Design a protein with these regions (language model features):
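Iron-associated oxidoreductase/ferritin-like identity signal
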Residues: 1-152
Length: 152
């Protein structure tokens, strides 16, 4: 949940401050993805509560619980290519995280497993959109496409 909240903020603020994007499609994509990430965080928080846990309530504690270093949005709001590259890296990290969660929950917690596989599918879709966008603009991809691994 914590990494999802960080990604939400990164996407949201990028959509707000970015300049010089290659069209409104990218800004709209970031806004839509930000709202999806917020929805993911809500689903995960609800599942944590269902399992008897407590979600982290202090945003200052988000980075400590993610296992991923916080990557702040770029200060150069005109560097759309690097902003996209940063978001591709964020999606790849989310895919790795959700792959690990599917491995941990497969055969043990079917409710969480089903939740996480749905979130994983969303992240793969987001990553592929961004990689296709970068590829269609004739720029170097910078990252290899991550693929969701089957856990069975």
């Amino acid at each position: 949940m914590l990494g999802t909240l960080q990604v939400f903020y990164s996407l949201w603020i990028t959509a707000i401050v970015a300049e010089g994007f290659h069209g409104e499609e990218l800004i709209e994509h970031f806004k839509t993805d930000a709202l999806e990430e917020l929805g993911h965080a809500e689903k995960l928080a609800n599942r944590i509560l269902e399992l008897g846990g407590s979600p982290v309530v202090d945003p200052g504690d988000w980075a400590a619980g993610t296992g991923n270093a916080w990557v702040a949005p770029r200060k150069d709001f005109r560097d759309a290519d690097r902003m996209v590259a940063d978001q591709i890296k964020s999606e790849a990290a989310a895919i790795r995280h959700y792959n690990n969660m599917t491995k941990m929950t497969f055969g043990k917690d079917p409710v969480t497993y089903n939740l996480v596989t749905g979130l994983l599918a969303d992240e793969v879709e987001h990553e592929e959109f961004l990689e296709n966008l970068v590829g269609s603009k004739g720029r170097a991809r910078g990252t290899k496409a991550s693929r969701a691994k089957k856990t069975r």
